[in-house]
From Swiss-Prot:
Residues 351-558 form the MCM domain. Signal peptide: none annotated. It holds the Pfam family WHD_MCM8. The lineage of its organism: Eukaryota, Viridiplantae, Streptophyta, Embryophyta, Tracheophyta. One of its GO terms (cellular component) is nucleus. A zinc finger (C4-type) spans 180-207. The gene is MCM8. The keyword Nucleotide-binding applies. Belongs to the MCM family. A motif (Arginine finger) lies at residues 534-537. It comes from Arabidopsis thaliana (Mouse-ear cress). This is Probable DNA helicase MCM8. The keyword Transmembrane does not apply. PANTHER family: DNA HELICASE MCM8 (PTHR11630:SF47), DNA REPLICATION LICENSING FACTOR MCM FAMILY MEMBER (PTHR11630). One of its GO terms (biological process) is male meiotic nuclear division.
Length: 801
């Protein structure tokens, strides 16, 4: 069957005089000589002539004028097939392109070649490098990796996925000359698909030699690289126990080095098959598994979503809408945009509460924690990421949830990973350091080392949820760079590189011993370094405190989830909402004024009787749109509120031993305010945004800094608890006793000693009274204490005996 369905058009084939057979044939020979399975026939000449006619017309000339030189004399043309479809009138062209791309694409290359060099008025076709037409934006050929089967061999397909492995760039020999070992006759061989195949016998008359010497200086090479693409799994397509599908892709010439591990790419290419054992000589390995072949993609074009500029995305709205299925993360159909506009118009200022309660609706309460997760999903604005002359400022918001077992931390994390446009969920007790960052693996075929991306790199531009964070103490150090500098540096096996990891981290951890101890700091409860804890913008502590009303509501909510009705918020109908103090006793102190953020975020039993969560797929589109197109700026009034709160924190935090309140906390406040404005799709941060963020930060700090007596101690974000402070104070007192040869000290002397060592206690007088009650100090008179635990005091008491 010809290219035009039966081999002829409605008007019949053109006369040979109508086609410049000689000129077209010479160009076509340049493009199909590499493939010994193709031959120049009348169908190819006719198709090339039709393509020349299309590219010579006015719209076609505009496309051809976009040819780029890629260095080394090679040329490429990026051709949008949706645009080409509008100007092309060639019958059955796209059907044949899908079914026989290896026959159609060389004709397109030759047609562009002819039109371009006719404009340059040159006919030296043999002396110029080839022009490669890179076809993209063809949704009709898109297919998921799990559906790649033998039926697609030789067809044009488009796949979308994450790059997980990239090999080094190597030269691939396409042609080489050989000298006959007997008669010295020169023979030139073309290597199809890069397979080295010397001549079998000499072509000279009378010479039957089978020995040949390759002339390596005559070798013609092209750049060659292999990448491995892993499918992007959507939550709705999740299949239990199925390993994510991967496919090897071969990139050649100008396509090499277009992506790195972690990039999301759209690969358009031709499905091919390869037998790993076909050309391995010697012994039994030659026949081993000879019937088994492996599918791979010979790339025609690769589109990297990270490297696409903004004007490319907005150049043709109709084409970008049609590729919504292929580039699910960064493209929006007309229906998506209509939903975003209607959702914002319908709920207005209530958008934050609606989205917040759509995050894991099966978990009752925890509004402030859900608010922090929601802000982390939207993220702040990243600045100076591409400017090498400035220090990049991260926009990702990191959250850690610490608490007693059984409070729904893991479910919150899984829900966040499912809602995020690009989310990965990992469990700490089954994760290695390399699995989190990047691994260097050895390719069994080439013996080369290559990078294999870990969770933080694969989640670049999205969210990485790490459960059981306390079980992976040895891997904590690997996260320090990724969480602040937004990249992962690796130096292994002679490979030194830095990979992007612009990822928000939401972690969940259980305290040491199974129950959170208020008498200890967060660091001591988690056995986590202060450096890592300070990188989290928000630290939430969930405690399992008995509360009759809250327990009734939670139990009612859980029972309804297992009932036949399946309602998501039935507790609202039977009970009135609890006040701010019911879920956490500490909230009452901070929100005595009544109109707190927590009370505004709660669902009301009367107004929200018909509340239904936003579906995850629509929520993903809304979040993706906000992250890509909304970049809020700080207003003057909002900036003043955030600055005042930060300066107030600095005033309270004066102890030398605690983790200091630094500019990192100020940047956290700015990021949270940007995320709060993004939720409402606003380009300016308002005063209300700043107040909401300050309140969320207060909740986080209040939980982190409160001690076992309910006293807020601004030194408890890190460092030591009061038990360790007491030991430190008594040790210093013992040294002072030995130095001065006395065991009685006045209160003023103890004050000066406490100042000298930077003692972190809320009240020094109460602290001394507690030591007196515990028997470490003995009150000898007004404002005088004897140190009973010092070695000097013990030696004096033994002498008196």
């Amino acid at each position: 069957m010809g290219f035009y369905g039966g081999g002829s058009m409605a008007s019949g084939r053109p006369e040979s005089t109508g086609i410049d057979s000689l000129g077209i044939g010479k160009i076509l020979a340049v493009y199909i000589k590499d493939n010994e399975n193709l031959a120049i026939d009348e169908d190819k000449l006719q198709l090339t002539a039709e393509l020349i006619r299309v590219f010579s017309a006015s719209p076609g000339r505009d496309i051809v004028s976009q040819v780029n030189e890629d260095g080394g004399g090679s040329f490429s043309l990026s051709l949008d097939l949706q645009q080409f479809k509008k100007i092309s009138d060639i019958e059955n062209f796209f059907i044949n392109l899908e079914d026989n791309p290896k026959g159609v694409i060389p004709c397109m290359n030759a047609a562009v070649h002819k039109v371009l060099f006719d404009q340059w008025e040159t006919n030296e076709f043999e002396n110029v490098m080839k022009i490669n037409v890179r076809l993209h934006n063809y949704p009709e050929s898109s297919i998921s990796l799990k559906n790649l089967r033998a039926a697609y061999i030789g067809k044009l397909v488009t796949v979308h996925g994450t790059v997980v492995k990239v090999s080094t760039v190597k030269p691939l020999v396409t042609q080489m000359a050989f000298d006959c070992g007997k008669c010295k006759t020169g023979i030139t061989r073309e290597f199809t698909d890069g397979k080295f195949s010397p001549p079998l016998k000499c072509d000279s008359h009378g010479c039957k030699s089978k020995t040949f010497t390759p002339i390596r200086s005559s070798a013609q090479t092209i750049d060659f690289q292999k990448i491995r693409v892993q499918e992007l799994q959507k939550p709705e397509d999740h299949e239990e126990g199925r390993v994510p599908r991967t496919v090897e892709c071969e990139l050649m010439e100008d396509l090499v080095d277009i992506c790195i591990p972690g990039d999301v790419v759209t690969v358009t290419g031709i499905i091919g098959v390869i037998n790993n054992y076909m050309d391995i000589g010697g012994g039994k390995s030659k026949t081993k598994n000879q019937g088994f072949y492996y599918l791979f993609i010979e790339a025609v074009s690769v589109k990297n979503t990270k490297r696409q500029s903004a004007f490319e995305n907005s150049e043709d709205s109709s084409s970008s809408a049609q590729t919504a299925d292929v580039g699910d993360l960064y493209s929006f159909s007309q229906r998506d945009l209509e939903f975003i506009v209607k959702f914002k118009e319908e709920y207005g200022s209530d958008t934050f509460r609606r989205i917040l309660h759509s995050v894991c609706p099966s978990i009752y309460g925890h509004e402030i924690v859900k608010a922090g997760i929601t802000l982390s999903l939207f993220g702040g604005v990243r600045k100076h990421s591409m400017d090498r002359n400035k220090v990049p400022v991260r926009g990702d918001i990191h959250v850690i949830i610490v608490g007693d077992p059984g409070l729904g931390k893991s479910q919150l994390l899984q829900a966040a990973a499912a809602i995020s446009p690009r989310g990965i969920y990992v469990c700490g007790n089954a994760t290695t350091r390399a699995g989190l960052t990047v691994a260097v693996v050895k390719d069994s075929m080439t013996n080369d080392y290559a990078f294999e991306a870990g969770a933080m790199v694969l989640a670049d531009g999205g969210l990485c949820c790490i459960d059981e964070f306390d079980k992976m103490t040895t891997e904590h150090q690997a996260l320090l760079e990724a969480m602040e500098q937004q990249c992962v540096s690796v130096a292994k096996a002679g490979l030194v590189a830095s990979l992007s990891a612009r990822t928000s981290v939401i972690a969940a951890a259980n305290p040491v011993g199974g129950h959170y101890n208020r008498a200890k700091t967060v660091n001591e409860n988690l056995k986590m370094s202060a450096a890592l804890l300070s990188r989290f913008d928000l630290v939430f502590i969930l405690l399992d405190k008995p509360d009759e009303l809250l327990d009734k509501q939670v139990s009612e909510h859980i029972m309804s989830l297992h009932s036949a009705s399946g309602e998501t918020s039935p507790a609202l109908k039977k009970f009135k909402p609890v006040n701010a103090a019911s879920q956490n006793a500490g909230y009452a102190n901070m929100h005595a004024e009544g109109n707190s953020l927590l009370s505004r975020l709660r669902l009301d039993s009367e107004k929200d009787d018909d509340f239904s969560p936003v579906p995850g797929q629509l929520l993903r589109k809304y979040i993706s749109y906000a992250r890509n197109f909304v970049n809020p700026k700080m207003s003057k009034d909002a900036g003043e509120i955030i600055q005042k709160f930060y300066l107030k924190l600095r005033d309270h935090n004066t102890s030398a031993d605690s983790t200091p309140i630094t500019a990192r906390q100020l940047e956290s406040l700015v990021r949270l305010a940007q995320a709060r404005a993004r939720v409402d799709l606003r380009e300016e941060i308002t005063v209300q945004d700043a107040m909401d963020v300050v309140e969320i930060m207060k909740e986080s700090l209040y939980d982190k800094l409160i001690d076992e007596h309910g006293v807020v101690d601004f030194g408890r974000s890190g460092g030591m608890s009061q038990q360790k402070e007491a030991k430190r104070f008594l040790s210093a007192l013992d040294k002072q006793s030995e130095l001065q040869q006395k065991d009685c000290f006045s209160v003023s002397e103890m004050y000066s000693l406490a100042d000298r060592i930077g003692l972190r206690v809320p009240d020094i007088d109460t602290f001394l009274e507690n030591l007196n009650i515990a028997g470490y100090l003995l009150k000898k008179g007004p404002k005088t204490y004897q140190v009973l635990s010092s070695s000097y005091s013990r030696s004096q008491s033994s002498r008196s005996r």
